[in-house]
Amino acid sequence: WVFGNPYFGSWGHKYQIPKEQLENIQNSKYIFLSHGHPDHIDPDSFDIFKNKTLILADHYGDRIYNALKKNYNCLKLKNNTWLEISKNIRIKAFADWNQDSALIIEIFKKNILFHLNDGQALGWSKTIKDLIKSYDNRFLLKLINWGDADMINFYNNNHFILPLAANKSPCGESYNYYMKKWNCNYAIPFSSMHSYIREDSIKMNEFTTPLNLHYENFNQKDGNLLPAFIRWNCEKNDFSEINPKKNIEEIRTALDFGDNWSDELESSDERDLNDYFQKFYHLKKKFGFINFRIGNKDFNIKLSNRKEGIKIETPRNSLIFAIKNNIFDDILIGNFAKFELINVPSLYPDFNPYVAKYGDNGNARSKNELKQYFDYYKLNSVNYWIDFLRIKTEEIIRTKLTNYKKIYSIARLVRRKL
């Protein structure tokens, strides 16, 4: 994401990209695309792709690869396979079952950059840990913040529910935890330099993490948490800071991006919405309905006779664009849409992954498609069952404690100190 405003104009860059760094991007021979979120692969940045090799992980469905290979030089890298891109640099990619991917970058045989981005390296955790630990300098690049980069705009009877991010838990403790988990001795604030610029999402800036607070409660016994913007000298093991200027973002209206909160659904929109959500087999097992409040009218989609449901209030234009282009996650992360959960504690694990990740990105919606999808990752992920059992255990605990945010925060802190 170099140019543009992802998530239907909701996000902007918090910092300017200096001219020198922009030239470095434009002069690079390779670009790694980790996943499909527009803050990682924004259409307004596509001109940069010309005359470059785009590297992608080996995902089920190959959605991004198939879309881009028509116009760009794309290289699909097999999992856990070294690719030498210069005399002193080689890389490995790892695809996980959430349609995220991680990248290992080896420099001079002694430095490792572990580019985890927004993911968890599901199915590859032990393999990656064992690989990283033998290097001198091990850098962790991972999304760590208070937790705004997901749908947090939840309501209960028109009253906004404070998200977990409102606790503003010290990020330094999270850096310590993840550095220890991944055997890294350096970390850099990463994948968190955005702000909200749409008039209907700017309130979420309260929950974005100021750069200085990334270092709060960080314990240097586990390594070094470096400044966010640096040039690292691999020969001298030293760095210099870049110090980019902060952007002063102009607040944009929803209309600037084609959204009018007064627009109502047309009959064809209702058919498209119903067709889109009825394809998801798993939703029918877990939810009874999804109700859309668009303009001044409600449109209800019945999925089953269950009592669990979701109410969504959002502008028509971006919603219809999202379902027609299979990018519903952009509605969630934009945080201008309002969500209300009925008899269900969270969008995880039964809505978000099945719609946005396995469905939209993996093209797996029916019972049979989901089986093929997970069979693929079972066969192509060395540590699948280790990570699967860990994730399922965490989901059970998180679901039980969702209504007790303080207890959940304390439990998470205790777990990370063990």
Description of each model-found segment:
Residues N27-I41, I55-H59, F114-G119, F139-N145, ...:
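Active-site neighborhood of phospho(di)ester-bond hydrolases with catalytic His/Asp-centered motifs
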Residues W1-L33, P43-D44, A121-D136, K311-I312:
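Pre-active-site segment of Zn-dependent metallo-hydrolases
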Residues K126-K221:
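Cap/insert and terminal regions of metallo-dependent hydrolase folds
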Residues A57-N111, E216:
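Metallo-beta-lactamase
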Residues I17-T81:
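Active-site HxH/HxHxD metal-binding segment of metal-dependent hydrolases
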Residues W232-L418:
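Feature captures hydrophobic
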Residues N24-I25, K92, Q99-S169, E250-F257, ...:
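Mobile, glycine- and charge-enriched loop segments
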Residues G36-I41, D62-Y65, T81-E84, N98-D100, ...:
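Active-site environment of divalent metal-dependent phosphoester hydrolases
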